[in-house]
């Protein structure tokens, strides 16, 4: 690879000396001001849909699927959810490490990860939604394939997230591409909710009026076995519906990966063209974790993201049992996601007009009154839909802002450590790591708390203790986490003035690097 860098300098030097025709010369100064086409931004944005589509389907439906369709004990379901999310979190820095060691290829450094992980991710995703016909080992089946899928989708999403820094050198173009990406990602959540919810919703999952029998006489045990056999048989349509939905989402996953790989090309930093020395991951990790702006940003978003993930993981059960909208919850979820999709452009305009920190406070805090309203008022379908639409506006801000602010932190890091390069994947992977790990802990604990409250698998109704627990999990706890996260954002140092200063300083640094490179190349051309 080092030889390739030398050849690049000779090529530039020859161009400077007039030895190459104008069509072959590389306009370095113009390149830094090139704009991304709308087509390139759309192709880049489409790549964000697979992660969100599968993640939304798993986030909203996996818990209720394990409890009421696979009929696992809540304790084992909590283990699967916790271990799967925790493993998902661990794989992010692991993949980030291997990406930092990956050499550049003709397809780039990041794109091969996306291409080769896709088919295996789709297969493992489908097997998560398949109920094996085995009397024992179901827990291990779901645990293994859930972890395999999380590993493979991480191999897709971490390089895709880091790709933000390599589609353009212009901060404004990256922000614009990020807005496109967030719009498509939220649209991906709409697709995930719509496909999974509408297909599964058409197959009515039967419930048990009085589960389970409290008497342990031989007669009651025999009757219980007969009833459970009958109900298991009646679940066939529901199980088939889950597999059909998984097949459709898997097809979309492949389509989006193809569009991304064909329509987007990685761009290397001009300074990186001069050296292909291997990057020290652990030295980079130490530098990243000591960067104050990064720690303050991910800490704030850690709590706010955790609030929305906790809401996501328990909302289906909350709508089904606490609100009593068993046949409407998929439409309520769809209303949230549609509202979020339609308001992404508004938040992009808002953060451009008023600044990103202001957008954080206004956007995320707007969810608080609606989270309180949905549990304080009596169950009312119209009010629930209004709350869902309003909550979607806040969800849009929570989607957009972290990914719009992380590149600002990376630019700040580059100015403080101009000699340290190739650590972009570390920033993104460890942000996702902390978010996923804490969400795994919270989701595992929330499912376990339902078990302690007396959750009845496939019951038509639940004990009052379960309803109280669900209210806490979708209202009180998320509100507390949001308020704590917003308090921590007060410490985040990069405001709009600081961001503009960093942008100008980074542009000056790049122009200085380009000028130095061109001077060296001219001297080399004169020697030639």
UniProtKB/Swiss-Prot annotation:
Residues 503-513 have a biased composition (Basic and acidic residues). Gene3D superfamilies: MFS general substrate transporter like domains. InterPro entries: MFS_2, MFS_trans_sf. GO terms for molecular function: fatty acid transmembrane transporter activity; lysophospholipid:sodium symporter activity. It is found in: Cell membrane; Endoplasmic reticulum membrane. Coiled coil: none annotated. Residues 503-528 are annotated as: Disordered. Disulfide bonds join 207-460. Glycans are attached at residues 218, 227. GO terms for biological process: carbohydrate transport; fatty acid transport; lipid transport across blood-brain barrier; lysophospholipid translocation; transmembrane transport. Keywords: Cell membrane, Disulfide bond, Endoplasmic reticulum, Glycoprotein, Lipid transport, Membrane, Symport, Transmembrane, Transmembrane helix, Transport. Residues 1-37, 100-109, 162-176, 264-295, 352-355, 405-427, 491-528 are cytoplasmic. Belongs to the major facilitator superfamily. This is Sodium-dependent lysophosphatidylcholine symporter 1. It comes from Gallus gallus (Chicken).
């Amino acid at each position: 690879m080092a030889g390739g860098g030398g050849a690049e300098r000779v090529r530039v030097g020859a161009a400077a000396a007039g030895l190459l025709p104008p069509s072959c010369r590389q306009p370095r100064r113009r390149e830094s001001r090139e704009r991304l086409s709308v087509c390139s931004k759309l192709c880049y944005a489409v790549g964000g849909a697979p992660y969100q589509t599968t993640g939304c389907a798993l986030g909203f439906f996996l818990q209720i699927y394990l409890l009421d369709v696979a009929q696992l004990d809540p304790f084992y379901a909590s283990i699967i959810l916790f271990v799967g999310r925790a493993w998902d979190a661990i794989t992010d820095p692991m993949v980030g490490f291997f990406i930092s060691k990956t050499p550049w290829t003709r397809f780039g450094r990041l794109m091969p990860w996306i291409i080769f992980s896709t088919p295996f991710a789709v297969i493992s995703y489908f097997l998560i939604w398949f109920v094996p016909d085995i009397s024992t080992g179901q827990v291990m089946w779901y645990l293994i394939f859930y972890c395999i899928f999380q590993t493979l989708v991480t191999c897709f999403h971490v390089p895709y997230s880091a790709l933000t820094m390599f589609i353009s050198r212009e901060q404004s173009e990256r922000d614009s591409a990020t807005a496109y990406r967030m719009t498509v990602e939220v649209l991906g959540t709409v697709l995930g909710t719509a496909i999974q919810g509408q297909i599964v919703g058409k197959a009515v999952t039967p419930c048990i009026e009085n589960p389970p029998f409290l008497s342990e006489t031989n007669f009651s045990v025999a009757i219980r076995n007969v009833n459970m056999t009958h109900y298991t048989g009646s679940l066939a349509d529901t199980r088939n519906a889950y597999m059909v939905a998984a097949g459709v989402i898997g097809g979309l996953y492949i389509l989006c990966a193809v569009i991304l790989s064909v329509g987007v090309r990685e761009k290397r930093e001009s300074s990186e063209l001069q050296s292909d020395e291997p990057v020290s991951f652990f030295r980079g990790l130490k530098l990243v974790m000591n960067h104050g702006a990064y720690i303050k940003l991910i800490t704030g978003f850690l709590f706010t993201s955790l609030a929305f993930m906790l809401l996501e993981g328990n909302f289906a059960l909350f709508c089904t049992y606490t609100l009593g909208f068993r046949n409407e919850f998929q439409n309520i979820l769809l209303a949230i996601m549609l509202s979020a999709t339609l308001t992404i452009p508004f938040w992009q305009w808002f953060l451009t007009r008023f600044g990103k920190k202001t957008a954080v406070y206004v956007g995320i805090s707007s969810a608080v009154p609606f989270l309180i309203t949905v549990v304080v008022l009596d169950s009312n379908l119209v009010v629930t839909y209004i709350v869902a639409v309003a909550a979607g506006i806040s969800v849009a801000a929570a989607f957009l802002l972290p990914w719009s602010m992380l590149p600002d932190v990376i630019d700040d890091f580059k100015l403080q450590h101009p000699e340290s390069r190739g650590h972009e994947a570390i920033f993104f992977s460890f942000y996702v790591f902390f978010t996923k790990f804490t969400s795994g802990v919270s989701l595992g604990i929330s499912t376990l708390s339902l078990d302690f409250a007396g959750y009845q698998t496939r019951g038509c109704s639940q004990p009052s203790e379960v309803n109280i627990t669900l209210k806490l999990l979708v209202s009180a706890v998320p509100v507390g986490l949001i308020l704590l996260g917003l308090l921590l954002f007060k410490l985040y140092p990069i405001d709009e003035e600081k961001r503009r200063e960093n942008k100008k300083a980074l542009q000056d640094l790049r122009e200085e690097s380009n000028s130095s490179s061109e001077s060296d190349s001219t001297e080399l051309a004169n020697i030639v």
